[in-house]
């Protein structure tokens, strides 16, 4: 059996405990990252794991685990919203479990050249897949109103209009191309009190989510997981901020109860629940994990078990700002 990855994933034991890997099962680590969840799954049972990540650096970093797995781990460079297509291409059919660790990885945050962190000097990049427009590109061309919407909707920054105004004023003088430059601009209009988060936290979050289309990706990935899980298969999702957790919570709530049907057309069948919810309340990190990994403080884990009911129809994506809409006009 494979030794676990040296990387310790947030809520890793809880996540794998809920997945309950069994010999001969097929599991999808939809956000491979540093391979922590994959390593734990491979160590727990004689399973096959398909690891997906849009970041080619993460895929390259996982080759050692691939070798140690004895052929039980396959890595695929792709978005996790495409997990159904990935499973089909790998001949996996329906799978026994899917785990998702949503958002930016610790590895990405710690690499200054990736431009995710306001604490490290680097280019203002923020692309998980290292292709397409960067955060600097968005900052350069988005209107003041668009920037304010992006920072407010995806960063939940209540000073978004002031931040957007400051960005537009600063870029008129010189391009904003580094993390430090943007953090300094934000710090002049957002003033944190002692003990509060860094003034640039929400602005960086908003830009990162926007650049990578993270919330749309999550919506699509959850629906894809619903389609590829066999009855009894389990979906485990770890999220790190309220926007993500709300999407996951609403997904499980919508699929964990019988559809309302129509009082006007009572003969129509109600939608049967496609998931049995395993976590009535989200699981959070305990004091021991928090002592060793402060980044776990905002993590919430939710899980569900697939029933034999048909997958629910996919909902329309929310009408929030998109990268194509902002960049496509330029």
Swiss-Prot record:
Keyword Amino-acid biosynthesis among record annotations: no
SUPFAM superfamilies tied to this protein: Putative methyltransferase TM0872, insert domain (SSF81799), S-adenosyl-L-methionine-dependent methyltransferases (SSF53335)
Catalysed reactions, semicolon-separated: cytidine(1402) in 16S rRNA + S-adenosyl-L-methionine = N(4)-methylcytidine(1402) in 16S rRNA + S-adenosyl-L-homocysteine + H(+)
Signal peptide: none
Residues reported to bind S-adenosyl-L-methionine: 35-37, 53, 80, 101, 108
One CC-aspect GO term: cytoplasm
InterPro entries attached to this UniProt entry: RsmH, SAM-dep_MeTrfase_MraW_recog, SAM-dependent_MTases_sf
Any single GO BP term: rRNA base methylation
GO terms assigned for molecular function: rRNA (cytosine-N4-)-methyltransferase activity
Keywords associated with the record: Cytoplasm, Methyltransferase, rRNA processing, S-adenosyl-L-methionine, Transferase
Record EC number: 2.1.1.199
Compartments where found: Cytoplasm
Main subcellular location: cytoplasm
HAMAP family: 16SrRNA_methyltr_H
Family note: Belongs to the methyltransferase superfamily. RsmH family.
Task performed by this protein: Specifically methylates the N4 position of cytidine in position 1402 (C1402) of 16S rRNA.
Name under which the protein is recorded: Ribosomal RNA small subunit methyltransferase H
Organism expressing this protein natively: Rhodopseudomonas palustris (strain BisB18)
């Amino acid at each position: 059996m494979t030794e676990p990855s040296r990387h310790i994933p947030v809520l890793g034991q809880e996540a794998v405990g809920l997945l309950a890997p069994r010999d001969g099962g097929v599991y999808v680590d939809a956000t491979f990252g540093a391979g922590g969840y994959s390593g734990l799954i491979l160590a727990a049972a004689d399973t096959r794991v398909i690891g997906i990540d849009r970041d080619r650096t993460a895929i390259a970093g996982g080759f050692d685990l691939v070798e140690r797995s004895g052929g039980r781990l396959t890595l695929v460079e792709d978005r996790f919203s495409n997990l159904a297509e990935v499973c089909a291409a790998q001949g996996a059919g329906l799978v026994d479990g899917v785990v998702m660790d949503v958002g930016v990885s610790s590895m990405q945050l710690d690499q200054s050249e990736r431009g995710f962190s306001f604490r490290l000097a680097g280019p203002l990049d923020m692309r998980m897949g290292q292709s397409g427009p960067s955060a600097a590109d968005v900052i350069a061309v988005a209107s003041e109103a668009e920037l304010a919407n992006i920072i407010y909707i995806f960063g939940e920054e209540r000073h978004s209009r002031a931040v957007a105004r400051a960005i537009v004023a600063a870029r008129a003088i010189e391009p904003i191309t580094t993390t430090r430059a943007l953090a300094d601009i934000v710090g002049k209009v957002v003033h944190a009190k002692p003990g509060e988060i860094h003034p640039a936290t929400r602005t960086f979050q908003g830009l990162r989510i926007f650049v990578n289309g993270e919330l749309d990706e999550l919506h699509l990935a959850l629906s894809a997981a619903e389609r590829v899980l066999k009855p009894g298969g389990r979906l485990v999702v770890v999220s790190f901020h309220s926007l993500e957790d709300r999407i996951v919570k609403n997904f499980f709530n919508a699929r964990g109860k019988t559809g309302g049907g129509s009082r006007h057309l009572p003969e129509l069948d109600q939608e049967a629940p496609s998931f049995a919810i395993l976590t009535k309340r989200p699981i959070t990190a305990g004091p021991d994990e928090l002592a060793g990994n402060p980044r776990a403080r905002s993590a919430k884990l939710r899980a569900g078990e697939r029933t034999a009911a048909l997958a629910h129809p996919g909902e329309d994506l929310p009408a929030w700002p998109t990268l194509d809409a902002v960049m496509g006009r330029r």
